[in-house]
Every structure is written in structure tokens, then in C-alpha cells.
Amino acid sequence: MNTTEITGTSLAPDASAAVIATEAPDWKANNFRHDLWMWTEKAGLSPLTRSGTDERPQWSPDGKWIAFTSDRSPSGDSGESDTDKPNRVWLISPSGGEALPLYREKLDVHTFAWAPDGSAIYVSAKAPQTHEDEDRQSDEWKDVVRWREQYRGDLLLKISIAPALARAVAMPLAKEIPGKAAGDAEPSAKLPEGASMIAKADVSIAEIAPAPDGKQIAFLTEPIHKRIENPADYEVFLVGGDGGTPKQLTHNTAMESHLRWSRDGHWIHFAVNAANGSIEGKYRDVQGRLFRMDASSGKIERLGSSFDGSFDLFTLLPDGRELALGLKGTEDHLYLIDGDKATRLPAMAGTYAGLEGAHNADSLLVRFSTINDPQQVYLVSNPMQPNKLKKLTNFNPVFAERAQPDWQPYTWKSDDGQSVEGVLIFPPGKKGAKHLRMFTFIHGGPADADGNLFGANWYDWATLAASNGWLVFRPNYRGSSGYGDEFMLGIEPHLVSKPGRDILAGVDALVKDGYADPDHLAIGGYSYGGYMTNWLITQTTLFKSAVTGAGAVEHAANWGNDDMTWDDAWYLGGRPWENPQLYQSEAALFQFDKVKTPTHLVQGGSDVRVSYLEGETMERALQSLGIPHTFLVLPGEGHGLDKNPWHGYIKVREELKWLEKYDKQ
């Protein structure tokens, strides 16, 4: 649990250096550190920043600066409390030294991007309230929250670097934008010196992509309240480099991401990740796809359509070629995209991630891991040969000193004859052994897949379970990505029952093949893995114990309480009043009279992805039935358990104890 995880990378324009962002637990401070590291050929890897709150590094186009976000306070601003510290954009020299704030005002940055010539940075931030609105709220509404009205859209600002740097050193007072009449676009509030308003949106701006000549800015929107209620909140817009009225380019049911311009400024490339909707027709949770759009006409073309796996990140090489990460089965590899074609490039056996190209060189940064090898950052000098890697980092070396579990893929037939694949992770030295106690560990998503990649944290502790003597079965049930659209769409509208049959068929096959001891079976998962765990303990008494986290036990209240309302409705064929039968028949709660399995529950106290109330409801059901159980509430934690590392540590510690306790009975 004491691992350093790589959260981001940025490659210098000439590929001579790289910045790497990491997250690591700070056990004494009860939080996670976020730091930046610099790699150069001469000096190797060394710390670049030490504040513990630095993320999302981006090199300037000329290589002179690195911009990043941080909630550190500018010098002299000691009055900022821990609860109101905004994320600002900061600048630091590649050679290190003191970081300088791009602005001092309390603007909480959502995203940022460098201007192509490096003279400015585009920033999106929530529009400040006008003084008039602040007074009106205080006088008329007191402490009453108006549910929808409380949200404000974003401003897209252009902040010139030269005056910002001068201001960071001199620390003058903020610039006051003159008050505007009611209804005017510009707020009466403090904006940074040298900032110009490019656009004002009624929604949040999630990505910014300036055209190569700087004359146009593409940006991607998302809901201001961060709840997925309507795919129309996710669209691509175009605005002039000096401002103007934004033009909407896309009108579809997909959630676009990863905007990138072609070098000639003709195309805007983008991705739609797995389970993020569809460009073509009605909303469907298909696999990840790649597209390019004519910036003038808005016409969209799909790329790499011959690939039947799931695309993720991509990068554009200086010569215009596109490379993409594609998940196929249990591994992610690199593919060269040429129209409809997707050609797999030579690769190491394992999982590639975090693809990023240099602006002025052919080199790539990638991350790579296997089940037994922690993820590291590598430099690829020839993009056509990603199997030839130069290792830049060596985080988490302790794993090389320990006995490692072995693994193998495993395939079986479901109840309807569908072939399903998963992964078996054996205790160290036990590969191929039979009659082992088995823990079925179900991945979340459901649009995801388990395979040959490293995991050692509160969410993915499969190798830890294997090291504690469990054969770990990780099924890629229907709804998983990397196995074709038909396989992924097979989950709808039977959200838990169909994948549940896939998983139970896998357990039966492993017992029949002699791998698993039928008297020593356990099950668990988090998020959608929790959904499935909750469901399967109503369908069978095979399992001696269950460990579940952040899994819905019913769907009607969760539809109203979570932040993925639209997707919930798609999976179940409509909103609760449109398909009430499925909302009941696919919910574990309505079959809880069948539950006999001792169950360990975990829930973040502030989770909105799967409402905390789902855990409370399930606990009450188990209590009323007299089923042995325990319920751990992790205060302040959302779905990702990213506030306090002790919460994740205690979660896994207690889950392992629960499995051991009931395996021995």
C-alpha cells in the first residue's frame, strides 16, 4: 500500500527531458503527496517540486517553462485556509528554482493549455460572482442553497506570460474589472493582470486546444455540476483566438475527449472512451473509438474502425501519423492508425499506458507494466518500435525483492455458450496448482478489463491476496471492454444478471477443472465490482464470505443520488418510471431473502458516484436478516478514496482479515 503511482507525464518539445507527476501516501500528514520529477539524460531522475500539491505538468512550446497546477499559496497569501485554497497555474524553470504563480487571484483552474507560440496560457475557471450577486445572495437568500442556480459556468481566459511573471515577482494588487449591467457577459470581479476574456460558457470547460496558428481555440465542455445527466453537455466548440462567439461543432450523444489539432490546422482529432456514448445515432456504451473532425465543416470521420478492441489515448507524430493505445483482451498495445486500418506495432508482453509524443521530435513517452512489474515511464526513440524502451524511472523497487505471484489467462463458456476470458493469479510458487482456495475479484466499470498490468493499491490488491495464499480469479464478464462492441453491449439492459451468469459459469468451470476448492470460495469487488458482489450473494451460497465496496444494492434511489444518472438509465433501459420492472428485477435488494454470505461493506462517506446511502441500505438489510456483516464508513472520501491513505490501508487490511476469518470456519 506504500506505493508511488505515476499520474502524469510531459515530454520536452525536443524530447531531451521529461517531467513526471506522482502520487504517494504521506502517512504522517494523513494525505497524499503530489510531486513533480525531472528526468534528463545527463542527470537522470530528480525532484523538481516539493510542495506536495503539484500536478498536471505541461512544457511550454519553446521548452523554457513548465506549467503545472497546485493549490499551494502564493508567497504573502498566508490568509488562505485549507478549505478555500484554489488550484492555480504555476510556472517553473526546467532547471528548478522557485515556482511562480501565473496569477494570484482565487480562480480555481479547471484546465489550461499553452498558446502555440508560448506567449500566453489559456485557462478555464469558474466565473467569479459579481459583487451584486454576492450581495443579493446574502440579503435575499441568506444560507439557503438554490439547487440548480448555485452553479456558474466557466470563463475561458488568455493570460500573457510576460506580465504574469513580472507580476509574480512584484506582487501588485489584482486588476479590477469594471462593473457591468445585469445580463452582461463579463463579471464584476478580480481577474488576473494581463488576462483577456476569450469566451464565457454556461457549462464547464474541460479541455482547451489552440490551433497551431493560434487563430482559433477548440474547447470541450462538461456539466457545471459534474453530474452526467445529458450527453449534450459534452460538446466541442470553436472560438477565435482573440475571442468572439463560440461555434458548436459537435451535436451527438458522445462524451468527447483528448482534443488534438493536426499540424496543418485542418482536423481536430479526438477520442470517445469506452462507455462514453456514441457519435453515431442514439446513445450506446460502445468501446473506445477514435475520430477526426473537419474544423471548418464539422464533418466527422471515424479512424481505425477495423480494430475490434477498445482505443484509449492517442498522439499525433510530427509527420501527422496517429498512434493509439488499444486494449485487446488482457493487454494494451500501440497501434498505427491509417484511415480505417489499425496496425499493431512490435511490443513487450504487458500493458502500455500514458502515451505522449514530443512536439518537435519523433520520440514518445509511455508507461508500461506487467502483473509483477510496477508501472514505470519509458522513452521510445522510434515510435514504430515501442518494444525498444529506455527506462526513466524506478519507483517501487521493493517489488523486485519479493516472491511474485504467477498468472495465466483462463477461458470458459458461459451458460449461453459465449466464450469469456479472465485472469488467474496464483500464490507465489503455485502456478498450475490445483484445489486452491479461490477469491473471485470483480473489476469495476463495467467498461474495463483485468489483464497483464500491475496493481498494488486499495482498489487493485489482487497480487496481495495471491501472496496471502489465494488463487485470484479476475473475470472479464460481458460489459468488459477489449472484446468487441457486441460483447460489451451484451450487458444492456440486464445490468447484473447476465454478467453474473458469466462469472458464476467461470467459478463452476474452475471448480470442475480442479483449480478451485469448492469448499473455500470467496468473492469481492468495488464500484461495479461491488454491484456484482451484492448481486451474486443473492444468487448462490457458494461463497463463504464477501467483501464489497461502493456497490449499489438497488437502482431507483441510486439513479437519483449518483453522478452518472444518464448511464444508469441506459444500462436499465430507461428511467425508473419508464422501466420499473428491470429496476426491481436487476436489483439485489429485492432478492435479499436469499442471502446467507457473511459480508464486509466499505463506503466513502462523501461518495456520489455510488451513493453512500446504498451502503447504508445494504447494511440495514443484512442487519434485519441477521447475516454476519460489518460496515466501514470512510469519512470525507469520494469514490476514489484519495483523501487519506490510511482509509485505503484499513480497507484492505480488514477485507483480508474478513476473508481469512470465514475461510477458516
Which residues are covered by each model-predicted region?
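Short beta-strand element of the alpha/beta-hydrolase
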Residues: 434-444
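A flexible loop/linker signature enriched in serine peptidases of the S9 family
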Residues: 22-35, 48-56, 67-90, 98, ...
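Residue-level detector of Asp-centered blade-edge/turn motifs that repeat once per structural unit
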Residues: 13-14, 61-62, 116-117, 212-213, ...
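Short loop/turn segments that connect beta-strands within beta-propeller blades
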Residues: 40-43, 93-97, 161-164, 240-244, ...
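Hydrophobic beta-strand positions that form the internal "hydrophobic ladder"
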Residues: 18, 66, 121, 217, ...
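The serine-hydrolase catalytic nucleophile loop
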Residues: 444-461, 613-614
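Non-catalytic accessory segments flanking enzyme active sites
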Residues: 8-10, 122-124, 131-133, 149-156, ...
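Active-site-proximal cap/loop segments of hydrolase catalytic domains
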Residues: 441, 461-464, 474-665
